[in-house]
Amino acid sequence: MADSQLFCVAEERSGHCAVVDGNFLYVWGGYVSIEDNEVYLPNDEIWTYDIDSGLWRMHLMEGELPASMSGSCGACINGKLYIFGGYDDKGYSNRLYFVNLRTRDETYIWEKITDFEGQPPTPRDKLSCWVYKDRLIYFGGYGCRRHSELQDCFDVHDASWEEQIFWGWHNDVHIFDTKTQTWFQPEIKGGVPPQPRAAHTCAVLGNKGYIFGGRVLQTRMNDLHYLNLDTWTWSGRITINGESPKHRSWHTLTPIADDKLFLCGGLSADNIPLSDGWIHNVTTNCWKQLTHLPKTRPRLWHTACLGKENEIMVFGGSKDDLLALDTGHCNDLLIFQTQPYSLLRSCLDCIGKNSIMLESQISLLPPKLLQQVLKKITFWAAANHREEQRVQKEETENKYQWISSN
């Protein structure tokens, strides 16, 4: 098999969903720009990335397919990927689907959840989801409501008075219990809720659901809040000790320890794509900016998932301001190490990088260890191939830009 086939990668995209379950990263949905047109990625394709071997594979999906969308909210509970909301050619969605990721024959079948109790949220996209006690807990987002549905949890952006439909930002909380198949809204017991927003990000630490940043009207924010997921009380805006990250939207927030959150990228208040990374300690309420991240590879509307050895896997997104120049969608996978790797992982990486020099010794390894080594050899071969392809692509783009400007 040619390297181009063996080392294939999921297509470029932004506004997609990604989750990690076991040894695999799963990617679905999103959109890409082709000749100034927004094209949604196929709804019957799911891509898997083997964390050990570094190989991507595309699988065709069956069942009750969701529409091809961007801005959907994806979350994983007990090996099932749940997709809620999003935006497609027909408008905003409030439909909920799931697919079992733990299949023996790699057959992925979508199911639309229609037999439920309660009332789902109004249609919206760019919302967030906390997973807690087998529940999907949704917050915020941008979408539409009818006049009869207007509440204090909604900031109006635009309206169609003829159809009595309003568009805007939310700050309401909705829960879907996956065991009882029930939608409901919790009674918020106290605290000051965050103002309505979309394109924010969220993460769970213990029994607290954190949110950071996002956009409402023309304002991007850098405030941090949490909701106690047992008592349903808001923290109010958390007072930060020291420096804070810039105001932003379309960023990610990922838990990396019992008391730490990792913030990555986004679009700044002055519409600059960001490449920075920060770690927040929830015990000291301090942010610390990481200085070793690549400054030339900004990302916004990407995904960031935690791997099995606490590495952050950032996939897709855009390197341009989507609101002005919607062309720079990405499909490279950025991996950020947040703690020292195990001795076994370090040894496997060393062998994988130097497999030619160690070729005669590798075959002498015990079978189980040999399989791990062979996967790691494939991992580094794939990584080197993709880096070469990326550099060549950048050189071609830079050459084209130089020719265009001269």
UniProtKB/Swiss-Prot annotation:
Its main location: cytoplasm. It comes from the Eukaryota. One of its GO terms (cellular component) is cytoplasm. Keywords: Cytoplasm, Kelch repeat, Repeat, Ubl conjugation pathway. Pathway: Protein modification; protein ubiquitination. One of its GO terms (molecular function) is ubiquitin-like ligase-substrate adaptor activity. Kelch repeats lie at residues 24-76, 80-134, 135-181, 208-258, 260-307, 311-361. Widely expressed, with high levels in skeletal muscle, pancreas and liver. Undetectable in peripheral blood leukocytes. The keyword Flavoprotein does not apply. GO terms for biological process: protein ubiquitination; ubiquitin-dependent protein catabolic process via the C-end degron rule pathway. It holds the Pfam family Kelch_KLHDC2_KLHL20_DRC7. SUPFAM superfamilies: Kelch motif. It is found in: Cytoplasm, Cytosol. Substrate-recognition component of a Cul5-RING (CRL5) E3 ubiquitin-protein ligase complex of the DesCEND (destruction via C-end degrons) pathway, which recognizes a C-degron located at the extreme C terminus of target proteins, leading to their ubiquitination and degradation. The C-degron recognized by the DesCEND pathway is usually a motif of less than ten residues and can be present in full-length proteins, truncated proteins or proteolytically cleaved forms. Component of a CRL5 E3 ubiquitin-protein ligase complex, also named ECS (Elongin BC-CUL2/5-SOCS-box protein) complex, composed of CUL5, Elongin BC (ELOB and ELOC), RBX1 and substrate-specific adapter KLHDC1. PANTHER family: KELCH DOMAIN-CONTAINING PROTEIN, KELCH DOMAIN-CONTAINING PROTEIN 1. This is Kelch domain-containing protein 1. It comes from Homo sapiens.
